[in-house]
């Protein structure tokens, strides 16, 4: 791998970080010079005495980044020990007779070349060992000792035992963590589980109520006047009937039920019906009197009366709308007999009861008075017609 500025900068920063050097403890060679001649040292570090440096880790990092066999040279300058870092080991410095041990003595201007292979040779175990170096001052003047200390097991058997212990501790910690997680989850899930049980019970009760309601669906809604009512044999209602809904504003239809007792506007309608019946009765008597006298009872004589009756009913004589179809007749139970309801009787016309003349129930006590009044009015109308007949004949002549 060719040296470039990016790789040069990365190696310098890694060296300063791993060896924990300050700004003044590392001298860096220019990147352009290193790119032209890779045999120059990339950097020189001034090492302190009695300080542990991770030399094996730094060599492994440089080898992985450069794809070469890096080389570190410890050199005694007389007052301190410098560490020169090379990407490639200089040929003139590398001699086959050199020897690197755990304890090395450096005199003035002497150097010690250390590679990754040398460190692996002095390791007590090939696995689980990290070698570090320490610079110590010797008893002699200007002499330093370089110690390569292997941190780890003493042999392969101890390394395997250490691995078994580490794996056992890891498995125990993992199982304990899983057990604690399950316990915490069970304790924290007690509240939601109780809530789920209550919710399921509530949903079951709601479903039961809905099924009981849907088992027998209610009959389709009908108009209040068409609903069947249980009555006794005498014709009186067995129980109080609920009042019908209020009439819509502007509606010309009025309720014709006989059991509301004027709560929905039937009283005014009953008065209007009485007036219409009286007017029609008077018109019939007048027509009979005119026919007996041999007079013409054409359209001019009965048109004002019909217009008056039509105005009372709220329907124009020139624009008559077809009557709305009545709803289906409902039946009322009268003892053991079934009869149409009061609304149907009012729509379809007067139906004769079991006994007595046809009159509304509320006018049963006023029957004789009404008959007497009608008789008096008929007599008065007849006398008026007889008195006005000579005048009409004189006008004709």
Swiss-Prot record:
* Record's compositionally biased regions (Basic residues): 310-322
Q: What is its main location?
A: host cell
Q: Where is this region: Disordered?
A: 205-245, 291-332
- Keywords on record: Host membrane, Host nucleus, Late protein, Membrane, Phosphoprotein, Transmembrane, Transmembrane helix
User: Which stretches are Perinuclear space in the membrane topology?
Assistant: 1-358
Highest taxon in the source lineage: Viruses
Task: Give the family, as the similarity comment puts it.
Answer: Belongs to the herpesviridae NEC2 protein family.
What is the protein's given name? Nuclear egress protein 2
Give the originating organism: Human cytomegalovirus (strain AD169)
Record gene name:
NEC2
